[in-house]
């Protein structure tokens, strides 16, 4: 299972009964925003070749949209393609880690354990278990080696395995680093955490989550994919070798995904979970603060990770997020915690970044973020070039010379037919040559452009170049 800090992920949603189907259909999002989200999802699927995506959106703290795109099952010589629906389930992979962290925090709230307890208090015999804390395993700062860093299912993972066998193998190896001194993504950490939940409660991990979280939130579609494959009414997982044809992905052996990536559900139900994160309805406020606070290393360096969640800054807005990938499925869940917005995306092909791309393009649109001054200037110049004009008062001499009548005409003839982009967002900034460098993504349904600019301290532009995105 790849590191969700570096993977980009997609997955779709599935249901099992007409009653559930009716309950999962949601569409109260503003039509203009809905159209932009639909266009983004369709474009990303077209560009990546991912068969399907299921998307659910929370706005103002409430689920307002659930929709699926593409084919949940591809056509074969004997059967037609099956369209994806919002009622279909997909494996959510490492997004499951949020639920494991929540289980630990629930137990801390009732005094059953503490985040700063050594894990050896509950699971004797692990490497330096008297030093490594529960907080460190939930934040990937323990030093325990990842049992699945590969981006494919090895033959050794096809037979069944138990959590205890994983712990006995990887939890008793020498640590990769001193506890608390580095951040390194490791699924082993969350297998250990799940085992602690079972030890403390005396109940199976999935049963505890069902009783304390899923039933409370009305998440009726949740499936334990670590113990049974998804059904025929759920999305089919796919993978490919190099750029070859899509093939049905092999399933990991039972037991391998315990507590680290075992859950499957609809995007609709993942969005119900996001509602609870925004409303802080499952845990006490102090527990959410611990979960959402970036864990710092012993040297004071940040990790961009809390407890089972990534902690990011998106253009000045706090984002609590995580991706997930298991064989044939990729997902992404982004929650703009102070804006009441969440975007959950599930896809049914592994090793592709469609889910993250959809989530990160859609989230600021749903939140209604206004363009920054730098973005607005870039957009205004872009619109002017589409009409065959350029405001030379904004340009330094070199750039003014660059925009010859021929150059302006080429910009107009190539950009005007594209119309209004879906998104126009700054993606990077840096200092170079006494100027500020900025790059922007310009996204269309069937085209992705990159704009690069250089700006002097006095605000004059030295560069404004557009090219196809690599």
Task: List PLM regions with ranges.
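Short, conserved catalytic-motif segment at the N-terminal edge
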Residues: 28-90, 112-117, 172
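Short, surface-exposed loop or secondary-structure junction motifs
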Residues: 71-73, 130-327, 332, 337
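Exposed beta-sheet edge and beta->alpha loop/turn motif
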Residues: 429-470
């Amino acid at each position: 299972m790849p590191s969700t800090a570096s993977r980009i992920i997609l997955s779709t949603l599935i249901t099992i009964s007409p009653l559930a189907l009716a309950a999962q259909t949601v569409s109260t999002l503003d039509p203009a925003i809905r159209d932009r989200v639909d266009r983004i999802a369709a474009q990303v699927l077209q560009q990546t070749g991912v068969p399907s995506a299921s998307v659910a959106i929370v706005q103002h703290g409430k689920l307002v949209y659930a929709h699926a795109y593409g084919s949940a099952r591809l056509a074969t010589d004997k059967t037609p393609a099956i369209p994806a629906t919002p009622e279909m389930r997909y494996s959510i992979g490492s997004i499951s880690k949020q639920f494991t962290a929540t289980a630990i925090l629930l137990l801390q709230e009732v005094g059953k354990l503490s985040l700063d307890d050594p894990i050896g208090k509950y699971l004797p015999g692990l490497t330096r278990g008297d030093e490594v804390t529960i907080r460190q395993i939930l934040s990937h700062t323990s030093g325990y080696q990842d049992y699945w860093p590969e981006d494919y299912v090895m033959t050794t993972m096809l037979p069944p395995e138990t959590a205890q066998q994983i712990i006995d193998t990887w939890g008793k190896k020498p640590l990769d680093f001193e506890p608390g001194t580095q951040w390194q993504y490791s699924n082993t950490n969350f297998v250990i955490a799940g085992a602690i939940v079972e030890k403390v409660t005396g109940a199976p991990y999935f049963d505890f989550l069902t009783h304390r979280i899923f039933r409370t939130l009305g998440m009726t579609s949740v499936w334990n994919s670590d113990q049974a494959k998804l059904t025929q009414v759920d999305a089919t997982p796919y993978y490919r070798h190099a750029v070859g044809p899509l093939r049905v992905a092999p399933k990991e052996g039972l037991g391998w995904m315990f507590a680290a990536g075992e859950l499957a559900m609809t995007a609709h139900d993942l969005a119900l979970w996001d509602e609870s994160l925004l409303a802080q309805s499952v845990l006490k406020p102090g527990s959410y603060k611990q979960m959402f606070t970036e864990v710092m290393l012993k040297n004071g360096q940040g990790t961009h990770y809390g407890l089972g969640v990534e902690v990011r800054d998106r253009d000045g807005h706090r984002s609590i997020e995580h991706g997930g990938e298991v064989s044939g499925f990729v997902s992404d869940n982004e929650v703009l915690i102070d804006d009441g917005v969440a975007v959950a995306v599930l896809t049914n092909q592994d090793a592709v970044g469609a889910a993250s791309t959809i989530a990160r393009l859609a989230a600021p649109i749903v939140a209604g973020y206004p363009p920054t001054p730098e973005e607005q200037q870039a957009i205004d110049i872009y619109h002017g070039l589409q009409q065959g004009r350029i405001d030379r008062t904004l340009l330094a001499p070199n750039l003014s010379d660059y925009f010859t009548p021929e150059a302006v005409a080429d910009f107009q003839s190539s950009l005007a037919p594209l119309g209004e982009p879906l998104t126009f967002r700054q993606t990077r900034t840096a200092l170079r040559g006494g100027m500020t460098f900025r790059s922007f993504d310009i996204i269309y349904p069937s085209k992705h452009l990159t704009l690069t600019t250089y700006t002097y301290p006095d605000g004059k532009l030295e560069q404004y170049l557009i090219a196809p995105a690599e």
